[in-house]
UniProtKB/Swiss-Prot annotation:
InterPro entries in UniProt: CENP-L
Compartments where found: Nucleus; Chromosome, Centromere, Kinetochore
Free-text function comment from the UniProt entry: Component of the kinetochore, a multiprotein complex that assembles on centromeric DNA and attaches chromosomes to spindle microtubules, mediating chromosome segregation and sister chromatid segregation during meiosis and mitosis. Component of the inner kinetochore constitutive centromere-associated network (CCAN), which serves as a structural platform for outer kinetochore assembly.
GO terms for biological process, alphabetical: attachment of mitotic spindle microtubules to kinetochore; cell division; spindle attachment to meiosis I kinetochore
Any Pfam family the entry gives: CENP-L
Protein name as catalogued: Inner kinetochore subunit fta1
Family: Belongs to the CENP-L/IML3 family.
Stored PANTHER family: CENTROMERE PROTEIN L
UniProt KW keywords: Cell cycle, Cell division, Centromere, Chromosome, Chromosome partition, Kinetochore, Microtubule, Mitosis, Nucleus
Subunit structure: Component of the inner kinetochore constitutive centromere-associated network (CCAN) (also known as central kinetochore Sim4 complex in fission yeast), which is composed of at least cnl2, cnp3, cnp20, fta1, fta2, fta3, fta4, fta6, fta7, mal2, mhf1, mhf2, mis6, mis15, mis17, sim4 and wip1.
Length: 280
């Protein structure tokens, strides 16, 4: 089965990084799902997060399920967490929360693992990237479960400007001048008088830029500076959002990958992965 079969595309995710999950075993996915279901329904005590959250109390949890996929020659192993639930205010509508856990897209050396004091053998698993799409209150509870059950740290995956540029290179090689939608780029400044700058480039103009075999971004920066005297390469400006016909990525870790990008999704997710194992 492909990611498309799991409704992966055309929805917005928030990206996270996880430290190794200790005591996690693929052979125990059914039991882990049952534990999470019980945790979401009843919590661990009667005075904790669950009874204090009115928003979470509105959720009626049906079931949490972990499923293993991937591990092929073209795609690494990944897990999918599905949580089905209703809300007390609307019992007629079935809702679902999703989380994808991806193992490393690149092979780390044993030296790197030793240096970062991470043992990837035995009953610990390292997921380099997790993509979450679920109600905020539900996610807080799932995060708490993973931290308590597997002694893992979960951190927001902020997307640096360099990674956004890497995605633009991947996108340029993929579209081959065939895009029918404009490209939209946004830079933030941190200056209250000019908080952000957004530029939209029409498809016909993109085709002209793409005639060159080189990366279009430096050419675009020169053109903008020449026409507007605005130097977007200045350190004051930080690329914060890339909106293409294949995917939307933001520096805050939000991303939406469209079904058109199926043949580059591996490269896009690889670009989000850290170049070396992080230290926790």
């Amino acid at each position: 089965m492909t990611l498309r079969d799991h409704h992966f595309y055309n929805v917005t995710y928030t990206a996270y990084r996880l430290s190794p999950l200790f005591g996690f075993e693929y052979s125990n996915l059914t039991e882990i799902g049952k534990k999470l279901t019980r945790f979401l329904r009843y919590g661990t005590d009667r005075t904790g997060y669950f009874t204090n959250s009115t928003r979470f109390a509105d959720l009626i949890i049906e079931k949490a399920t972990f499923t293993e996929f991937g591990n092929t020659s073209s795609f690494p192993k990944f897990l999918k967490l599905d949580i089905s639930y209703e809300t007390s205010s609307d019992l007629e509508v079935k809702r679902k929360g999703q989380m994808f856990f991806f193992e490393s897209f690149r092979k780390f050396s044993h030296a790197e693992a030793d240096r970062t004091r991470l043992s990837l053998e035995g009953n610990s698993v390292f997921f380099s990237l997790a993509l979450v799409r679920m109600d905020g209150a539900l996610w807080m509870a799932v995060e708490q479960f993973l931290q308590q059950e597997f002694d893992t740290q979960i951190l927001p995956c902020l997307i640096a400007p360099e990674i956004l540029l890497e995605f633009l290179k991947i996108w340029q090689n993929h579209v081959n001048s065939q895009t029918a939608l404009p490209l939209e780029l946004t830079w933030t400044t941190g200056n209250p008088n000019l908080s952000s700058v957004t530029i939209s480039i029409r498809p016909e103009d993109l085709k002209k830029i793409f005639r060159s075999s080189s990366f279009f971004y430096p050419i675009l920066m020169e053109h903008i500076k020449r026409c507007t005297s605005l130097d977007l390469t200045n350190s004051v400006f930080s690329l914060s959002k890339v909106n293409t016909d294949c995917a939307i990525l933001t520096s805050s870790g939000k991303l939406k990958i469209f079904s058109k990008a199926q043949n580059i999704v591996f490269d896009v997710l690889l670009a989000l992965e850290p170049m070396q194992l992080p230290e926790y």
